[in-house]
Amino acid sequence: MITSRQLRAARALAGLDQRALAKASRLSLPTIQRMEASDGVVRGNVESLMKLIAALDRIGIELINEEAASTSGGRGVRLKGPAGPRAKRA
């Protein structure tokens, strides 16, 4: 599951506005706006959520759930490591 705070943070980390994220995920701008305005866990149909998560993955954003190993715990987002799509190849 992804929270609205994670979604906003992921979008900011990727340097995208809502319109660009909507285009990248093939969702409507109002859908992205509703998802970001959700309280807590993002609400939406499964297909829309899968499109959103896939788009973030392609962009190079990793979603971190609350069960992930971490010294401080909690949900979050981060840029993917060198194996991600933005990696420079020699």
Where do the language-model regions lie?
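Recognition helix of helix-turn-helix/homeodomain-like DNA-binding domains
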Residues: L27-G44
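DNA major-groove recognition helix of helix-turn-helix/homeodomain DNA-binding modules
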Residues: R26, V46-L63
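Short basic helix-loop element that most often maps to the first helix and adjoining turn
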Residues: L7-A20, G81, A87
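Short, charged recognition helix plus adjacent turn
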Residues: D57-A90
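Residue-level "edge-of-site" marker
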Residues: A24, N45, A69
